[in-house]
Amino acid sequence: MRQNNLIAKINQEQLRDDVPEFRAGDTVRVHARIVEGSRERIQLFEGVVIKRKGAGIQATYTVRKISNGVGVERIFPLHSPRVAKIDVIRQGRVRRAKLYYLRELNGKAARIPERRRN
């Protein structure tokens, strides 16, 4: 077996099949596993997906939320075992793949309208 095929096969085995379909503009709740000493707990991070990047095992997504008036962004690997689950709260209607402009907006201007489901 060639090395490229072997790497592709190993990567294919590591992909998660429980990842919901979401895209930039959607509001998601990420259940992240946090290890503190010998304890492991679940930490929730809810915000707007401002970008998705990459494909396959190296795919990532960035979630932005406002915490105490300060914008916080976290980058999560899509297929990471450290992410317990991803809940899609609402689907946003945007016309861009990367929503970096949200960093400059605040208050009501930073809201994203909900995408209508047919």
From Swiss-Prot:
Q: Which domain of life is it from?
A: Bacteria
User: Which GO terms are recorded in the biological process aspect for this UniProt protein?
Assistant: translation
User: Does this UniProt record's set of keywords contain Lyase?
Assistant: no
Database matches in InterPro entries: Ribosomal_bL19 (IPR001857), Ribosomal_bL19_CS (IPR018257), Ribosomal_bL19_sf (IPR038657), Translation_prot_SH3-like_sf (IPR008991)
The task this protein performs is described as:
This protein is located at the 30S-50S ribosomal subunit interface and may play a role in the structure and function of the aminoacyl-tRNA binding site.
An example Gene Ontology molecular-function term: structural constituent of ribosome
Q: What is this protein called?
A: Large ribosomal subunit protein bL19
Q: Which keywords has UniProt assigned to this entry?
A: Ribonucleoprotein, Ribosomal protein
**Matching NCBIfam families:** rplS_bact
List, alphabetically, the GO terms of the cellular component aspect: cytosolic large ribosomal subunit
* Lineage start: Bacteria, Bacillati, Bacillota, Bacilli, Lactobacillales
Entry-linked Pfam families: Ribosomal_L19
Q: Is NAD one of the keywords UniProt gives this record? A: no
* Protein family membership: Belongs to the bacterial ribosomal protein bL19 family.
